[in-house]
Amino acid sequence: MRLMLLGGPGAGKGTQASLLINRYKIPQISTGDMLRAAIAKGTPLGLSAQKIMESGGLVSDDIIIGLVKERLKNPDCDRGFLFDGFPRTLVQAEALKDAEIHLDHVIEIAVDDEEIIERISGRRIHQPSGRVYHVVNQPPKNPGVDDITGEPLIQRDDDKEETIRKRLQVYHSQTAPLVQYYKEWAESGSKEAPKFHTISGTGTVEQIFDNIVTILET
């Protein structure tokens, strides 16, 4: 089962990814994790990436693809894998295709921008414990304070509306075109193309997961 999840920030990809890797016993392949592991091991690709990152540059798609190919040789990928945060751009998607790294399913979890903003901007954190609340979906007993300690809750900078809107702009300009790319490829009838599905990201975690499993196992 070789999977990729697409969707905006706050669409629920991380939650569903955790459930999917547990159900299908496949690893979650994260470019960030791969970079850190390659640098720690001192592999040639890792050392190349480290030099670029230390100089403040962006790691090239060639290096990222090389790391992906290296990672997929590990025995834990024999049953498949789930891509997390990769590819992010059309250039990376084309590079993945050229490298003949095949996918079975690409699933877009679709959520309206305004709902994403409400989901993320409503989060409140109790920093010392890491407890998370939501002003609408999981409010504290008393507004603005932690249930257990009575200490104040904060809103992280990443959860502020202005920051979320900027992240959504980046998503729509860079990553959302992947939806069209994989949709058109699937519709082309190519044997190499993964199946493409769009599901609603609105509903309970369990409902969304059941919808994904139905797609994958039908």
From Swiss-Prot:
Domain of life according to the entry: Bacteria
One Pfam family named in its UniProt record: ADK_lid
Span list, region NMP: 30-59
Positions with a binding annotation for ATP: G10, A11, G12, K13, G14, T15, R123, V132, Y133, G203
InterPro entries: Adenyl_kin_sub, Adenylat/UMP-CMP_kin, Adenylat_kinase_CS, Adenylate_kinase_lid-dom, P-loop_NTPase
Localization per Swiss-Prot or TrEMBL: Cytoplasm
Major location category of this protein: cytoplasm
Positions of disulphide bridges: none
Name under which the protein is recorded: Adenylate kinase
Organism: Legionella pneumophila (strain Corby)
